[in-house]
């Protein structure tokens, strides 16, 4: 529902925009950009109509404020007067009015729960929703069970509960120098991408992705541990072991005390994004307007972004936290270009186009080596299981819509034994816009299973390759299966009109829904 108003990055037709399930954009009036909204919030103008007072809002009171010039919306228990924001919302006033006078949390989460609404709307805060009196209960006994790794059944989601007693749990054990936290997921499709670990001071946090849910261990450790730790996964039984090094070789009487949402299993759509600060290690030009950024994770973090998923980068800009989605890439397509001293599990690479008149990317580009950027946990619905027994893989990319294809290419050519052919059709405006052209050509020369075709919409007269935009003629010639009944997957990513048109054309060419994956988040 609430959408960051932006005339900058990702631009309305940018391939790096995380699309939102078919929502239409409306043209904003001049002077209604994100920067204009930030200026308004800093102007000192009373945007709530309450002259700085915060109030407790009842359901009855919230319902009264349901008009365009008097619109209150509740998000996660906080009530905002969004009337001043109406003209700045790219989704239009009608989209905001869907939640007028009501709790808009679910609608907000459906579209873009990643938006930092607390920062964007802090000057519109009316107050909290009034909480109905609740009967107090003694949680001490339950807390004791929680720290023994027993998950209260009330915290198991209905989805997994229906599947039987195989819900996750955890335990811990120790030696003189080590503490091992063991997570029993009861699932067999668990790998190192499934677990995210962050610990800072005495706070320990481990998120395990189990199907469409997240199992959270969140503990204030009873003793200090070293920053470095190791993570092991036993895939055959779905067991994860996190091995911490004690700072002092003493015996622990207990692991620690529970922190927020500890030992809970929550649908991923209902969880907030968790950020950690990553350090900018390098930045290099790839094209005239695209850079390769390398960020280093904290030593106290384990995070591997799964293939086809994205993260959010967050920067403070003029006092407001701005968040944008990006798909991580490999440091290179070719092994000889890769730095062996940089382990994959500690570094994240991004190919990012810089928009000179934008708000976010120029600020990102101004960062110096050693500066920090906040990086979220991964999101996305691409499943690596789509590659099982795959024979033909077709990739359609436009501009920086190439980013999800980087890891897909690396994985496909090294880890899919059944693969016969990979074909990439890469759309750009000019030759100067083609990302990693030389690497793609060298990779295709080395591996005869790979074909790469470049298509330019505004080439110079000397260009001998294909020209134009995505079309039936281009695709019908390009998308030929190796065998009539071979298992095939077509991945497509680019600006929203490119992707939508491409998916329509693929259906016209008789590709089924299961044979198409569009990266629109």
Swiss-Prot record:
<dbReference type="InterPro" id="IPR051872">
    <property type="entry name" value="Cytochrome_b5/Flavoprotein_Rdt"/>
</dbReference>
<comment type="similarity">
    <text>Belongs to the flavoprotein pyridine nucleotide cytochrome reductase family.</text>
</comment>
<dbReference type="InterPro" id="IPR039261">
    <property type="entry name" value="FNR_nucleotide-bd"/>
</dbReference>
<dbReference type="GO" id="GO:0003032">
    <property type="term" value="P:detection of oxygen"/>
</dbReference>
<dbReference type="GO" id="GO:0042593">
    <property type="term" value="P:glucose homeostasis"/>
</dbReference>
<feature type="domain" description="CS">
    <location>
        <begin position="165"/>
        <end position="256"/>
    </location>
</feature>
<comment type="function">
    <text>NADH-cytochrome b5 reductase involved in endoplasmic reticulum stress response pathway. Plays a critical role in protecting pancreatic beta-cells against oxidant stress, possibly by protecting the cell from excess buildup of reactive oxygen species (ROS). Reduces a variety of substrates in vitro, such as cytochrome c, feericyanide and methemoglobin.</text>
</comment>
<dbReference type="Pfam" id="PF04969">
    <property type="entry name" value="CS"/>
</dbReference>
<dbReference type="GO" id="GO:0048468">
    <property type="term" value="P:cell development"/>
</dbReference>
<feature type="binding site">
    <location>
        <begin position="392"/>
        <end position="424"/>
    </location>
    <ligand>
        <name>FAD</name>
    </ligand>
</feature>
<dbReference type="GO" id="GO:0005789">
    <property type="term" value="C:endoplasmic reticulum membrane"/>
</dbReference>
<keyword id="KW-0256">Endoplasmic reticulum</keyword>
<feature type="binding site" description="axial binding residue">
    <location>
        <position position="112"/>
    </location>
    <ligand>
        <name>heme</name>
    </ligand>
</feature>
<dbReference type="GO" id="GO:0015701">
    <property type="term" value="P:bicarbonate transport"/>
</dbReference>
<dbReference type="GO" id="GO:0016174">
    <property type="term" value="F:NAD(P)H oxidase H2O2-forming activity"/>
</dbReference>
<dbReference type="Pfam" id="PF00970">
    <property type="entry name" value="FAD_binding_6"/>
</dbReference>
<dbReference type="GO" id="GO:0046677">
    <property type="term" value="P:response to antibiotic"/>
</dbReference>
<dbReference type="GO" id="GO:0005783">
    <property type="term" value="C:endoplasmic reticulum"/>
</dbReference>
<keyword id="KW-0560">Oxidoreductase</keyword>
<dbReference type="GO" id="GO:0020037">
    <property type="term" value="F:heme binding"/>
</dbReference>
<keyword id="KW-0479">Metal-binding</keyword>
<dbReference type="InterPro" id="IPR001433">
    <property type="entry name" value="OxRdtase_FAD/NAD-bd"/>
</dbReference>
<dbReference type="InterPro" id="IPR037908">
    <property type="entry name" value="p23_NCB5OR"/>
</dbReference>
<dbReference type="GO" id="GO:0048471">
    <property type="term" value="C:perinuclear region of cytoplasm"/>
</dbReference>
<dbReference type="InterPro" id="IPR008978">
    <property type="entry name" value="HSP20-like_chaperone"/>
</dbReference>
<feature type="domain" description="FAD-binding FR-type">
    <location>
        <begin position="273"/>
        <end position="385"/>
    </location>
</feature>
<dbReference type="InterPro" id="IPR018506">
    <property type="entry name" value="Cyt_B5_heme-BS"/>
</dbReference>
<dbReference type="GO" id="GO:0030073">
    <property type="term" value="P:insulin secretion"/>
</dbReference>
<dbReference type="GO" id="GO:0004128">
    <property type="term" value="F:cytochrome-b5 reductase activity, acting on NAD(P)H"/>
</dbReference>
<dbReference type="InterPro" id="IPR001199">
    <property type="entry name" value="Cyt_B5-like_heme/steroid-bd"/>
</dbReference>
<dbReference type="GO" id="GO:0046872">
    <property type="term" value="F:metal ion binding"/>
</dbReference>
<feature type="binding site" description="axial binding residue">
    <location>
        <position position="89"/>
    </location>
    <ligand>
        <name>heme</name>
    </ligand>
</feature>
<keyword id="KW-0274">FAD</keyword>
<feature type="compositionally biased region" description="Polar residues">
    <location>
        <begin position="1"/>
        <end position="18"/>
    </location>
</feature>
<feature type="domain" description="Cytochrome b5 heme-binding">
    <location>
        <begin position="54"/>
        <end position="130"/>
    </location>
</feature>
<dbReference type="InterPro" id="IPR036400">
    <property type="entry name" value="Cyt_B5-like_heme/steroid_sf"/>
</dbReference>
<keyword id="KW-0520">NAD</keyword>
<keyword id="KW-0408">Iron</keyword>
<dbReference type="InterPro" id="IPR007052">
    <property type="entry name" value="CS_dom"/>
</dbReference>
<feature type="modified residue" description="N-acetylmethionine">
    <location>
        <position position="1"/>
    </location>
</feature>
<feature type="binding site">
    <location>
        <begin position="365"/>
        <end position="380"/>
    </location>
    <ligand>
        <name>FAD</name>
    </ligand>
</feature>
<dbReference type="InterPro" id="IPR008333">
    <property type="entry name" value="Cbr1-like_FAD-bd_dom"/>
</dbReference>
